[in-house]
C-alpha cells in the first residue's frame, strides 16, 4: 500500500481536529481446541489460550498508535460462542466460564471480551438455554465480558421462544445490576455476523481461522467536517463528499490492521468502517444528518438522510480496502451520540423513529434506556420487531436496551466513558404479551429461497 504525503497531512488534521480514531483492534480467537467435559479443565484451557494468543495485543496497539499518530482507543478479544464450547461439560451454569473470560481479558489488559454468546436462530440446544439463563449472573459478576444472542436470520426465520427468553434475560439483568448497566453488555441479533470487531456484539465465528485480527475505525467528526467545508449543494454532491471521506478513513484503518497483523503474526481479517459515535461534541452521527439539512435528528427526512450516509460510507470503504466486513455502516447508539441525546431529550427522536432508521443503517436499536418497570414481554416485542426488519431486508439488526430500575420517562441515566448517558424513553402502553407467549418460530420469508 502506497501512502502519499498529502494523505498523511489529512490524517493529522483528522486526528487533531475531528476526533478521528481507530476504535478497536480486536483479535478473534477460536476456542474449539479448549473443549473438555470437565468445566474446570475447560476454564483453564480458555484462560491459557486467550492469554497466550492475546498477550501482545495492547503493546502492539500502543506501538502503532505512537508510530502513526493515530489514537487506537480499544483493544478487544472475541471468542467462539461459549454455548458451543461449554456444551460438553453438561453444566447447569456457565457463570464460571464468563468469570474466566473476564480474568483472562484483564490479565492481558484489553478493554472488553465478547463471545459469551448463543446462536439460536432456528432452535435452542440445552447448552444454548443454559448460557442464556446464565447471562444475568454473568453480567453481574464480571466487568468486561459481553454477551450476544442471535435469535433470527433471513434463512431461518425468528425463534420466538428465544425472543421471549431474551426479553426475560434482559429484564432480570436490569434488576440485579446497578441502573441496569449489565444490559449495556448484552446484544440480541438477527443475522449476526461472525467477524464483528465492535462490542457488545462481537464473537468469533465457527468459519473463522484459529485467530484473526479485525479492525474497527470511527470518524463521524471527519465526515461532518468534510461536509461543513465542502461546497456541496445537491444530495448527489453530499453523497460524493461522504464517499471520498470514507475512503480516506478506511485507508488509515487498513494500514493499522495490516501492520498489527504483521507484528502479531496473526492473519488480518476485516476492516469494519462503521461510523461509531462517542458522547464527545464533534463526534456525532446525528450532527452529520443535521449538516445535510435537518433541523434536528429524528424529524421527517432523517431516515432518508441516514440511508444516504450509510450507502456512501460503504461505497467509499469498498474502494479503499478489499477486506471490508463486519457491520460497516453508521451506528446510532442513543447514549453514545451527543446529537442523538439532545434530539431524544427534545422529544423529536423517539423509539419509533429509531426503529425506522434501523431499516437503513448499520445495526439497530442501540443503547436505549427505557423505564425500569417495562415488562419483559414488551422488551421481547421490541426485539421481535427489530428482528423482523433484519429478517425481511436480509441485514443485520440488533437490540441493546436498558430497562433502568427506579427510573421513568424524563429521567436520565449516566453510564460513563464511551457509553455516555441516555434520557429514559417511553415504550408503548399496549401489551404484546399474548403474542410473545405464543412462542414457536416466525417462518423464514420468501426472500430466504435464493438457490
Swiss-Prot record:
Q: Which CDD domains match?
A: RNR_PFL_like_DUF711 (cd08025)
Q: What is this protein called?
A: UPF0210 protein NGO_1297
* Assembly with partners or alone: Homodimer.
Originating organism: Neisseria gonorrhoeae (strain ATCC 700825 / FA 1090)
**Mind telling me which InterPro entries this protein's record contains?**
UPF0210
Q: Which HAMAP family match?
A: UPF0210
Domain of life according to the entry? Bacteria
Return the similarity comment. Belongs to the UPF0210 family.
